[in-house]
Amino acid sequence: SRIAIEVCKSNPEIIYARMVRNDTAFCNGGQQISGLYKSMDGGDNWQQVITDYNNSGLPCDVLGGFGWYFGRIGVNPNNPNDIFLLGVDLYRSLDGGISWVRATPDWWTYEVHADKHEIEFFENGDILLGTDGGLYKLRKNSTEWEDLENIATTQFYRVAYNPNNPSYFYGGAQDNGTSTGNAQNINNWEAIYGGDGFLPA
């Protein structure tokens, strides 16, 4: 089991804790979320926020069985009732965890990469989201995430090139598919496959 704890920066008396359980008979098996708790007095007393997943909007398998891998809760310092649960997808609650909505498109659309791990809030209302596939930005009062590309962080497992055009490469990366492009124009590479790229040829 695993516990994720997040303290509200603007009011340290407000703390959220997310519990994970490993139970093959619970919610499709694997390590799934088993409870979300909230304290209003700095951790002296706790109240379970979600008691009925069927009516909360938050699926019990939101972590995809990977509770050991996902652990982050995000609490907006400008509004402690505005919280995010990071997993394969991203869910958001505006009422302190009672009801939830999906905050990003389905992971398999690749509009926002799967596997969300980090979230950061800014005073102007903007939000940054860190994923296995890079960094995304949500501007204040917007619902569209912006992919902050051209950050040179992708690590390829293996690279292949076109022998008829030696400056044209293919690179395979874990969780970030296969990308292709010209060595002289690195800003215009494109992703041609999703998932794990590994060994392009």
What are these regions (language model features)?
Residues 1-201:
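Beta-propeller blade termini and top-face loops
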